[in-house]
Amino acid sequence: MLCLPVFIILLLLASTAASNPLETRIQSDLIRAALEDADMKTERGFLGVLMKGLKYLGKVVPIGSLVKDLLSSSDE
């Protein structure tokens, strides 16, 4: 007779936990997608800043002469 209430309680606990894995899977997918978006935004932002810096550097010092100087110094 004592087994019946325990069985009912376990059945209730199991039924409430059944919907949880789907929710956590969806939540983890959403979190992963958000992190990938944030990572891509960071890369685009970093590359944009890097390209702007190189463009500015190209205006100050011509990139061709800078590369030529670097290549000639590595030959020595």
UniProtKB/Swiss-Prot annotation:
UniProt superkingdom: Eukaryota
Tissues with expression: Expressed by the venom duct.
Keyword set, alphabetical order: Neurotoxin, Secreted, Signal, Toxin
UniProt GO molecular function: toxin activity
GO cellular component, one term: extracellular region
Residue ranges of the propeptide: 20-52
Record-linked InterPro entries: T-conotoxin
Subcellular location: Secreted
Pfam families per record: Chi-conotoxin
Residues annotated as signal peptide: 1-19
Entry similarity comment: Belongs to the conotoxin T superfamily.
Miscellaneous remark of the record: The mature peptide does not contain cysteine residue.
Name of this chain's protein: Conotoxin ArMLCL-022
Organism: Conus arenatus (Sand-dusted cone)
